[in-house]
Amino acid sequence: MPPAKKGPATSARKGQKTRRREKKNVPHGAAHIKSTFNNTIVTITDPQGNVIAWASSGHVGFKGSRKSTPFAAQLAAENAARKAQDHGVRKVDVFVKGPGSGRETAIRSLQAAGLEVGAISDVTPQPHNGVRPPNRRRV
């Protein structure tokens, strides 16, 4: 006997309510920009560290090596800033981490999106002679 066909996947959830995010009213926050060689992640938090909005180069729609470009970082920062402004964020302190190419571009696009940037600090972790670094590329 062939297996019974199941209905559309949405029918099981018809009666359930979807959980909407409540709008937080946070006028001052912190923007954490993690820029690696492969991607850029922008996270905007409240002063306690709870995430309000985030975006990354991959989340915006870039794939592969295009995620590491400054333009991808710019779009990710604009996207995160727009989401944060919906929650009432107007001023941010920026914390930049990592060696990637999207660091300065992301800060500039946060300002261009309408957020007032306060302090900018580099929180890239520096090893006190930790693990052995990867080999230099021979091209």
From Swiss-Prot:
PROSITE patterns for the chain: RIBOSOMAL_S11
Family classification: Belongs to the universal ribosomal protein uS11 family.
Function: Located on the platform of the 30S subunit, it bridges several disparate RNA helices of the 16S rRNA. Forms part of the Shine-Dalgarno cleft in the 70S ribosome.
GO MF entries: rRNA binding; structural constituent of ribosome
Gene3D superfamilies: Ribosomal protein S11
SUPFAM superfamilies in alphabetical order: Translational machinery components
Region (Disordered): 1-33
Gene Ontology CC annotation, any one: ribonucleoprotein complex
InterPro entries with a match to the protein in the record: Ribosomal_uS11, Ribosomal_uS11_bac-type, Ribosomal_uS11_CS, Ribosomal_uS11_sf
Biased composition (Basic residues): 14-23
Keyword terms of this UniProt record: Ribonucleoprotein, Ribosomal protein, RNA-binding, rRNA-binding
Oligomeric and partner information: Part of the 30S ribosomal subunit. Interacts with proteins S7 and S18. Binds to IF-3.
Gene Ontology biological process terms from the UniProt entry: translation
Organism of derivation: Mycobacterium bovis (strain ATCC BAA-935 / AF2122/97)
Designated name of the protein: Small ribosomal subunit protein uS11
